[in-house]
Design a protein with these regions (language model features):
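Carboxylate/His-rich catalytic cores and anion/metal-binding grooves
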Residues: 116-124
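N-terminal alpha-helical transmembrane segments of multi-pass membrane transport
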Residues: 22-27, 31-40
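Peri-membrane helix termini and adjoining interfacial loops of integral membrane proteins
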Residues: 30-36, 132-136, 277-281
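Membrane interface segments of multi-pass transport proteins and intramembrane proteases
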Residues: 102-110, 137-146, 293
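Juxtamembrane helix-capping/reentrant segments at transmembrane boundaries
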Residues: 36-50, 104-117, 284, 289
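Alpha-helical transmembrane segments
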Residues: 1-27, 57-95, 125, 129, ...
Length: 319
């Protein structure tokens, strides 16, 4: 328990310390976010905001996790697999951001190219999990052998979480405010199940996210970019798979799941009927265009994430 707290505090401090000089560097190099023309009008004001803040978020997570795990004598293959997966997801996101910055428009990797990278990276923790758990998934105290479906489910969860987190990162402070309760639930379930390594890394993610909020709260000084969102989402999915709470991710990650479903429903509806269900997707843009302020949306989504995360922990205990 002490090491989990150490991991959180160390990551928080590191994120705050790394953030200031990195943002100054981004401003000096004119590393700016380009806003989609289809985005709500209010977002035009965000043009020129530095991006790739995920670099110092993930750096804080990796450094604090390694230090804490070494102090706790918990640095093992499981920890390395999680951190290596996080590193490569960060690289994929950074490549996407780099192409957008270089082209001075909001076009990075092609959707197919991005998905291929995510799938290949997701295979790392999937193969490790199969080596440890075979093809068995758990839900509380219950176990289910799903056979050949296991690797498909694992890859789907990790890539899905990565993309869902990315879709959620559309308002100042939204992704981190929604992500913190999700990582808290994942870490709590992992701790209760004896997966201390997963709990420690979850704590690092929470600490770094809290630190990043200082720079990303309205009006944001920096955006995490795909560097941060793809990596944090991929990390959440990876921790859920290795921490054996992959099914409960649908509950404690309910907000990012809803954001993703809103996009799927919007696109499907328009293709089939020519009509849109929402004013704009993802879901947070629908509320924006309905007259809700960014701050209100972030608070309400964060509250929803907290309630769902609490429900997931309770379900884990009761089932």
């Amino acid at each position: 328990m002490i090491m989990i707290a150490v991991s959180l505090l160390l990551s928080l401090v590191l994120c705050l310390l790394l953030g200031v000089p990195y943002i100054q560097f981004l401003k000096k190099k004119n590393v700016e976010q380009y806003i989609l023309e289809l985005a709500p009008e209010e977002h035009a004001k965000k043009a020129g905001t530095p991006t790739t803040g995920g670099v110092f978020i993930i750096s804080a997570i990796i450094i604090s996790s390694i230090i804490t795990l070494l102090l706790a004598e918990k640095m093992d293959t499981k920890a390395l697999v999680i951190l290596i997966t996080l590193f490569f997801m960060t690289l994929a996101g950074f490549q996407d951001d780099y192409l957008k910055i270089k082209g001075r428009e909001n076009k990075g990797l092609s959707p197919r190219g991005k998905l291929l990278r995510q799938i290949l990276i997701a295979l790392i923790p999937t193969l490790y999990a199969m080596q440890c758990y075979g093809s068995v998934i758990t839900l509380g105290s219950k176990s289910f052998d799903i056979g050949i479906l296991y690797p498909l489910l694992s890859v789907f969860i990790i890539t899905g979480a990565s993309n869902a987190y990315n879709l959620t990162d559309g308002l100042d402070g939204l992704a981190t405010s929604v992500g913190i309760p999700a990582f808290l639930a994942c870490g709590t379930i992992a701790f209760l199940s004896g997966h201390t390594v997963v709990a420690i890394i979850c704590a690092s993610a929470i600490g770094a996210s809290l630190g990043f909020l200082k720079f990303n709260k309205p009006k944001a000084e920096v955006f995490m970019g795909d560097t941060g969102s793809l990596a944090l989402g991929g990390l959440l999915g990876t921790l859920a798979v290795i921490g054996r709470c992959e099914l409960l991710l649908a509950v404690f990650g309910g907000v990012i799941v809803a954001e993703t479903l809103s996009v799927i429903l919007q696109v499907s509806s328009f293709k089939l009927t020519g009509k849109r269900i929402f004013k704009m997707s993802p879901l947070h843009h629908h509320f924006e265009l309905s007259g809700h302020s960014e701050v209100r949306i972030v608070k309400e989504f964060a509250l929803a994430s907290f309630v769902l995360s609490l429900a997931a922990v309770i379900l884990h205990i009761l089932i």
